[in-house]
Regions:
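Solvent-exposed N-terminal domain segments of exported/luminal and surface proteins
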Residues: 2-5
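Extracellular structured ligand-interaction cores
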Residues: 38, 66-68, 107-113, 122, ...
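Short catalytic/ligand-binding loop motif for oxyanion handling, primarily in non-cytosolic enzymes
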Residues: 62-64, 79-81, 183-184, 205-207
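Catalytic core of Fe(II)/2-oxoglutarate
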Residues: 129, 137-213
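Catalytic core of non-heme Fe(II) oxygenases with the double-stranded beta-helix
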Residues: 76-167
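Short, low-complexity Ser/Thr-rich regulatory SLiMs
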Residues: 73-75, 116, 186-188
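A short beta-turn/loop motif at secondary-structure boundaries
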Residues: 61-63, 122, 188-190
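Signature of the catalytic double-stranded beta-helix
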Residues: 8-77, 84, 96-104
């Protein structure tokens, strides 16, 4: 599996190497995963693209490419994925997005993932009834702050509405993850929760759809 790009900072030689390795990984994706998930994802997005070409963005200096998808394995007892949205990640991983933003309209990106194997219990995707355009600050894992300075306790149903989705094996979800605050609930039971996923957005010239992870 690929190394996380945020660990490289701005070192161009390491970034070039990262992008080259990504392309090699993608060329061997059937061997790596036992199934051509990239073709499945690309075919799905092509049916939704309105005729636009769908592809993975090229790497720095046109060397290699971004990674098309990542697998996430969350083990029971190892917690959850805390509340976040795609737009807030641009502040945490600005080095990553600095290059991607040259070709891709990453703001308000769309998120997708496919459930490969759900946990025995827990692991639901929770979508909260607040958007990045209204709420842009994380106080802690259970508290957000909106643009009016009001605190939102995401554990309190009187403070915010939410929708929980439990996916079955093979289910794919596509949602406005750039704007919608969301989290993955704690994994319980004895089974790992295994998904693949990533993001999709228009190219800067609106002539293509790019997907990456």
């Amino acid at each position: 599996f690929s190394t996380a790009i945020e660990s490289f900072g701005k070192d161009e030689s390491e970034l070039n190497s990262y992008f080259v390795r990504n392309k090699i990984f993608r060329e061997n994706i059937v061997e790596n995963f036992g199934f051509d998930f990239e073709s499945l994802i690309q075919d799905t997005f092509s049916q939704l693209s309105g005729g636009l070409k769908v592809e993975v963005p090229q790497g720095m200096n046109d060397k290699g490419s971004y990674i098309s998808l990542t697998a996430k394995i969350i083990k029971p007892g190892q917690g959850s994925i805390p509340i976040h949205c795609g737009n807030v990640l641009q502040y945490y991983f600005d080095d990553f997005y600095e290059h991607l933003e040259k070709s891709t309209s990453v703001y308000d990106q769309v998120s997708y993932f496919i459930m490969l194997d759900p946990s025995d219990s827990g692991g639901e995707l929770t979508l909260y009834n607040t958007l990045w355009s209204e709420t842009q600050k994380i106080i802690d894992n259970s508290t957000l702050e909106n643009l009016d300075g009001e605190k939102i306790n995401i554990e309190d149903p009187n403070s915010i509405g939410k929708q929980q989705l439990k996916l079955n094996p093979g289910d794919m979800i596509i949602f406005s993850g750039g704007q919608i605050w969301h989290r993955i609930e704690e994994i319980r039971g004895s089974k790992d929760r295994i998904t693949i996923g990533g993001f999709i957005a228009y190219s800067k010239n609106n002539e293509k759809l790019y997907y990456w992870s």
